[in-house]
Amino acid sequence: MRINPTTSGSGVSTLEKKTLGRIVQIIGPVLDVAFPPGKMPNIYNALVVKGRDTVGQQINVTCEVQQLLGNNRVRAVAMSATDGLMRGMEVIDTGAPLSVPVGGATLGRIFNVLGEPVDNLGPVDTRTTSPIHRSAPAFIQLDTKLSIFETGIKVVDLLAPYRRGGKIGLFGGAGVGKTVLIMELINNIAKAHGGVSVFGGVGERTREGNDLYMEMKESGVINEQNIAESKVALVHGQMNEPPGARMRVGLTALTMAEYFRDVNEQDVLLFIDNIFRFVQAGSEVSALLGRMPSAVGYQPTLSTEMGSLQERITSTKEGSITSIQAVYVPADDLTDPAPATTFAHLDATTVLSRGLAAKGIYPAVDPLDSTSTMLQPRIVGEEHYEIAQRVKQTSQRYKELQDIIAILGLDELSEEDRLTVARARKIERFLSQPFFVAEVFTGSPGKYVGLAETIRGFQLILSGELDGLPEQAFYLVGNIDEATAKAMNLEVESTLKK
């Protein structure tokens, strides 16, 4: 682990040897800077512009070198707004990539892309910093242990279980519940999980970031009385930030997580919401730099950029990073290059379906589209594997019969198919679950369901023991005992109405 104590976001001016350049062109967030011959900065070096604008306001803008243009000029992308910058202003080459604070000092705090705290709780100890650009761990350092990460969410644990130290993607279009699901996972895992978590808010809504912060303070994940005892560090580069900041904020969060893994030898949870915005910001920067766009207007370096980020998220012999990433799917098209490129890196995919969300089934996880490399008998056990396959087969058969039902009605089906449909509808409803983080909206208390309870519940539905219960009894409940209790209550209510 290379620690660089000389440069952090705000402390870059402490460098003794400064190379000065001058701005020669400004196009939005992109600056062209001229340097003296033989004093050219390297690619990814941090540049700092300091001075005053026309009304005397202090300016302090950090940029990152992206291209060497020739004629002693470089092209750099700004990490903050370029308002007030003028041609001829002095630019300092820090001589190193952007570095951010790492270690225990980051816990309980909110940072921007430069590693500067934005929570008004005072400065952060920056004695230990680390550059945001580094290579992925060598092949020989990797760890290949296989174990399941229990989430307490029935549909996930049964049909697409998560791997400890793996990469998980939550795929879905706009408004199907990706952020709510990621917040529930933080609630269930970060609280039960003894290690630390890092949350990277990449190009998402500022309101959601604020809600998450307030919720973490209420739940004790962030300890206001003693910040040092907090379990999470937050790094935000939201929708209103320039593309340079949104493109690099994921690396800032990852750098903090890597320190906990490599130096503190801890198991870390890394949440990224939303990895699509990382690609989107890269596409904007690519266009600003004048590169020819590739498929669907994305940057030609899409696979390289995604690979350089994802390959650093891995488990080594020192510790593990388990990463849970929300992936926005443009126009619900899973073949779009951004989600399609992300698919290749993941151990498990949780696909959210607009059809299920429209039916009011939350979490709206599609049981047939969601996959996991962990769903193998030798890893999860024969019973779990068999129940999961039977649930999928029943759901698949129901899907095939839906056209016939829509045209001819249920009565035209065979007795066997009618039974399959009845069980599939119970399964569909039993895959829904009340969330802790949605209590405020729904009014029903959240439920955590252990894996053994989940398997038992679906075993009873598939065996036919619960064929007599109404399907609404299975909707938004925790374990199967709650479903049978709800069925009894429904029966009592209907008797009283008569």
From Swiss-Prot:
Q: Which GO terms describe its cellular component?
A: chloroplast thylakoid membrane; mitochondrion; proton-transporting ATP synthase complex
Q: Which GO terms describe its molecular function?
A: ATP binding; ATP hydrolysis activity; proton-transporting ATP synthase activity, rotational mechanism
The record, for SUPFAM superfamilies, names: C-terminal domain of alpha and beta subunits of F1 ATP synthase, N-terminal domain of alpha and beta subunits of F1 ATP synthase, P-loop containing nucleoside triphosphate hydrolases
Q: What EC designation does it have?
A: 7.1.2.2
- Cellular location(s): Plastid, Chloroplast thylakoid membrane
> Which positions bind ATP?
172-179
Chief location category = plastid
Topology term for the membrane: Peripheral membrane protein
- Quaternary context: F-type ATPases have 2 components, CF(1) - the catalytic core - and CF(0) - the membrane proton channel. CF(1) has five subunits: alpha(3), beta(3), gamma(1), delta(1), epsilon(1). CF(0) has four main subunits: a(1), b(1), b'(1) and c(9-12).
> Main role?
Produces ATP from ADP in the presence of a proton gradient across the membrane. The catalytic sites are hosted primarily by the beta subunits.
**Which family is annotated?**
Belongs to the ATPase alpha/beta chains family.
Please state what the protein is called: ATP synthase subunit beta, chloroplastic
Please tell me the species this chain comes from: Calycanthus floridus
What gene makes this protein? atpB
